[in-house]
UniProtKB/Swiss-Prot annotation:
Its EC number is 2.6.1.9. Transmembrane segments: none annotated. It comes from Methanococcus maripaludis (strain C6 / ATCC BAA-1332). Belongs to the class-II pyridoxal-phosphate-dependent aminotransferase family. Histidinol-phosphate aminotransferase subfamily. This is Histidinol-phosphate aminotransferase. It holds the Pfam family Aminotran_1_2. The modification N6-(pyridoxal phosphate)lysine is found at residue 228. It catalyses: L-histidinol phosphate + 2-oxoglutarate = 3-(imidazol-4-yl)-2-oxopropyl phosphate + L-glutamate. The gene is hisC. InterPro entries: Aminotransferase_I/II_large, HisP_aminotrans, PyrdxlP-dep_Trfase, PyrdxlP-dep_Trfase_major, PyrdxlP-dep_Trfase_small. One of its GO terms (biological process) is L-histidine biosynthetic process. It comes from the Archaea. Keywords: Amino-acid biosynthesis, Aminotransferase, Histidine biosynthesis, Pyridoxal phosphate, Transferase.
Amino acid sequence: MSIDDKVRAIVKEFKAYVPGKSKEEIARNYGIDPEKIIKLGSNENPWGCSPKIAEKLMDEVSKLHQYPQPINPELMEEISKFTKMPVENIIVGGDGADEVIDNIMRILIDEDDEVIIPIPTFTQYAISAKIHGANIKWAKFDEENGFKLDAESVLNNITEKTKAIFLCTPNNPTGNVIPTEDIKKIVESTDALVMIDHAYIEYSKEEYDLTNWALKYDNVLVLRTFSKVFGLAGQRVGYGVTSKKLVDYMMRIKPIFSLTRASQVSAITALQDKEFFKKCLKEGIESREEIYNGLKKFKQLEVYPTEANYMLVKVKNGMNSSEFCEALLKKGVIVRDCYSFEGLEPYYFRVSIGTFEENERFLKIMSEIVE
């Protein structure tokens, strides 16, 4: 009997996650100087993390032989102040928000339970749900309507077997927010857990932030992360805000030491450096507008409005997305080919914000390819 015979059938159905390409990979494959590569493919903060973090991390080096605190009171307090949510309604994950997603699926899902996911959206939702035995019911962000959520496609899929519904807002990769009235309708129409993914909410208008719904509704869990505006994608810190009861259940099965000492210190310092946060947010929104307005000038592209730190672009010059992204790679520009997103035709790519210098170079290269 081979190892293939022992592997679960559901795992054999999966395709490996396709992450954004790294500068190192492109430098190797195309012989380009890494310093000249523009990385606009992974929704990162191009200005990095708070410069105060490096100093704090040096203080931690002498403690790396010690286990981290399973729950860091200082980190919990800082998150509480930032979100204006009680500490007891917060749970922190050490693999970004992915850990919170996975823990929720472990808690909720029995074989043949159902999870509703509108597509296109973040692919990790379906992977985590399926591996724990759920059947996926697909709803949709309507392409013909600017990728607005088709709320009826969610509501019509709700059954007595529905355990969870994922709503990403702003949605990845489309960048648009889900209207609050649609989310309210969904939350109030079911007792299934509605997971509102706010990974990019800092870049949106304040009115779209529904984090406080975790106190208003027992069936809401809001996902947040340090990977975007805080510039800590490499430290993998995320958190959930939800009912005290659900936090208690998650704490029973959460990996004990999943959040490293370095990650804890980095997250605390990032929250405390409010000036750097404000700078990154302000310049991030300005960068987004610069790229959006620049791309809108190309008639061969359709650029979708966004409330995140990236935007979705449709190629209409006869090339598919893979051909277009390959042309950019050869010139040292990394964007995200969206061919692997369920529910998207092979003509879309996603581009993240860059520094203003990177944006200028990117738009110049785009003009060479498009025109």
